[in-house]
Amino acid sequence: MLDVPLLIGGQSCPARDGRTFERRNPVTGELVSRVAAATLEDADAAVAAAQQAFPAWAALAPNERRSRLLKAAEQLQARSGEFIEAAGETGAMANWYGFNVRLAANMLREAASMTTQVNGEVIPSDVPGSFAMALRQPCGVVLGIAPWNAPVILATRAIAMPLACGNTVVLKASELSPAVHRLIGQVLQDAGLGDGVVNVISNAPADAAQIVERLIANPAVRRVNFTGSTHVGRIVGELSARHLKPALLELGGKAPLLVLDDADLEAAVQAAAFGAYFNQGQICMSTERLIVDAKVADAFVAQLAAKVETLRAGDPADPESVLGSLVDASAGTRIKALIDDAVAKGARLVIGGQLEGSILQPTLLDGVDASMRLYREESFGPVAVVLRGEGEEALLQLANDSEFGLSAAIFSRDTGRALALAQRVESGICHINGPTVHDEAQMPFGGVKSSGYGSFGGKASIEHFTQLRWVTLQNGPRHYPI
């Protein structure tokens, strides 16, 4: 069992009132972590610690910030076993957490490489003798709110580029993966970033709303970033706007994978299975809609069903399990209701659908239409639906018939045709002949429509995590009209 204290000003500490909450393995019910439940005063203290640490961190030479972030990346990767030990909080497979650690370490390395890329520019002025500059400077305290589903990747992403840009951070840990998020903070602390540069707050589920509001409302918090559901993202966006804090929001998705009539079906099937079922479909980029040309749909469905038959979900501790657990049994109940609704309205259950507690077998449905909840609602589970259309215009219309727009994929042997189509798909990300689930630390990552706004990743995120300022230097006398 893991004890999870708060991290405030470089110190591990309990909540001020001593309260804790527990996180149990969704499969076995075993107690995984006992976690400090922060009070509003703890939230204030975390922001105050970050604010106090900001001047020194912002003043560090960029190469020194780079050195410390690189050290953190090495330590993160070296402590992979500790992260895997905490995987029981969400019922995830060890290979998923191993993948998380590798990508998160690369995110820190990429952020380290960006410390010297925070560029300004000289802008010609109409005023004689005026030297005008646009400068990017650190903002101050950045609040990162991270989810549980890819806990190492997404919590690291929430703080890596803010740190590279010279900001200090408060990480609001997920109630479902608090030990993982707290461990990230400890790794950065142990790497020598400095007391208060990274602070981690955990809270009981019932306290989440008031803790988030308190953090956003704090005048010292200058930027907010949030990854999570569209429902909660709207709340975070509204709170941030009320307090005039720019927010970067990466929200829900219902990614389409388009299979054109000339696609390599074997490649499309492999990408679809990976994109739909890896980590039990609990990824914002997960392939939820398989939009297939009618000419090849029957063959595609048959091949995908055969692939899905090899993907057994079970207890992650069982070596026979290819896939793991949902985050909890209530997620299974919710997703099963979506499946049952589709079947009741005429969809064909091709394979899967069996639910035992938090274990849901990978599911494929055909014949889904707009009358069914699965057509529009994000399942966030191991469920993919087949939508058939005749010709690429019909496929495009189906792909764009969604409130979401995060990731998408197109399979075609004609790359020119696919590229032209990709430019018309309403998504922040589109991969040709690759899966919808794909992330690299240096790439711009963000969505459109109800999937949020702004981009994480490399240069794209510098704009959000710095303040652009206009500074002038007057050389010589200046004429004034009065």
From Swiss-Prot:
Q: Has UniProt tagged this entry with the keyword Nucleus? A: no
Against Gene3D superfamilies, the record matches this protein to:
Aldehyde Dehydrogenase, Chain A, domain 1, Aldehyde Dehydrogenase, Chain A, domain 2
- Please verify whether the record's keywords include Transmembrane helix: no
Entry binding sites for NAD(+): 228-233
Q: Which PROSITE patterns match?
A: ALDEHYDE_DEHYDR_GLU (PS00687)
InterPro entries cross-referenced by the UniProt entry: Ald_DH/histidinol_DH (IPR016161), Ald_DH_C (IPR016163), Ald_DH_CS_GLU (IPR029510), Ald_DH_N (IPR016162), Aldehyde_DH_dom (IPR015590)
The family assignment reads: Belongs to the aldehyde dehydrogenase family.
Protein name as annotated? Vanillin dehydrogenase
- According to its UniProt entry, this protein's organism is Pseudomonas fluorescens
